[in-house]
């Protein structure tokens, strides 16, 4: 029996049955258009046999589209009512036993997942999208690629290049793991309720070799945070607190890393930040 997808009327009926109202607190907007969830799966290049993790499956519209493509899904859902109902929804839409695993938990607290997923596909709750992405990339090194739907502003930040207006700490931290790209736009009309912001698809591929170990990552991210907290200041001032305490000491470290002390944080690539962290030997925060 082929997997069938949810329609708009069925999604609303499911929500009513569960007494679920999409909430701004959880950043919920349910996708009610089958073509959109198929588009996400297509852009993510989901193949039969792929092990996919989905964060925030909600009522299951994207979940079913991933399963329709022949992948297995581990779905992480914070709302107990939704997590409890999802297996029954999948079973009634032709999903084979064992293809779906539901983890009833806060995605930001999950550090282990069954099935060693290699692909992340999700309509991420907008208020936690960047923290969730960085958490999963940090804790699940087996994740090799992914496509997620996020608020347009967030997607532009994740895929931003140095020197652009949207380039910031999330851009650099995301780039630590590999390249990111904007992969498409999504109409507001495919959501229930209709959001007051635009949405985009953003994709990533993890680099074959990590940039460094966990200690270097923590050091690098600490420097990135300091640089963008005072993004208009020259790095010798912005980084003085984490590179010795004075602008002069920071300048010595920056020059050792091959970075101009008069540069600003928004001009640097992730590789520049890694070199600064390596040159500094900054102690990781306790």
Question: For each predicted feature, which ranges?
Answer:
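Catalytic cores of RNA-modifying enzymes
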Residues: 1-225, 255, 266, 275-286
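Short helix-coil junctions and helix-kink-helix linkers
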Residues: 240-245
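Short amphipathic alpha-helix in the helical subdomain of ABC transporter nucleotide-binding domains
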Residues: 247-250
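P-loop NTP-binding site
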Residues: 272
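Short helix/strand-capping connector loops at secondary-structure junctions
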Residues: 252-261
């Amino acid at each position: 029996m082929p997997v069938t997808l949810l329609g708009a009327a069925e999604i609303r009926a499911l929500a009513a049955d569960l007494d679920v109202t999409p909430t701004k607190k959880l950043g919920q907007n349910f996708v009610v258009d089958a073509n959109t969830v198929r588009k996400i799966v297509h852009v993510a290049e989901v193949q039969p046999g792929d092990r996919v993790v989905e964060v925030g499956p909600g009522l299951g519209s994207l979940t079913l589209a991933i399963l329709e493509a022949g992948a297995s899904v581990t779905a992480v859902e914070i709302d107990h009512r939704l997590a409890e109902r999802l297996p029954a929804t999948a079973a009634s839409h032709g999903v084979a036993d064992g293809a779906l695993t539901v983890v009833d938990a806060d995605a930001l607290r999950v550090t282990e997942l069954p099935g060693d997923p290699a692909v992340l596909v999700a309509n991420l709750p907008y208020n936690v999208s960047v923290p969730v992405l960085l958490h999963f990339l940090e804790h699940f090194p087996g994740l090799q690629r992914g496509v997620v739907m996020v608020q347009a502003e967030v997607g532009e930040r994740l895929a931003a290049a140095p020197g652009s207006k949207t380039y910031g700490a999330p851009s650099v931290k995301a780039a630590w793991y590999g390249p990111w790209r904007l992969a498409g736009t999504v109409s507001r009309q495919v959501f229930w309720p209709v959001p007051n912001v635009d949405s985009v698809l953003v994709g990533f591929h993890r680099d074959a070799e990590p940039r460094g170990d966990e200690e270097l990552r923590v050091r690098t991210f600490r420097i990135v945070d300091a640089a963008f907290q005072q993004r208009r200041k020259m790095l010798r001032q912005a980084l003085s607190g984490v590179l010795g305490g004075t602008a002069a000491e920071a300048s010595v470290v920056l020059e050792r890393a091959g970075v101009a002390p008069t540069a600003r944080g928004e001009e640097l690539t992730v590789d520049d930040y890694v070199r600064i962290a390596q040159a500094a030997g900054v102690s990781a925060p306790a």
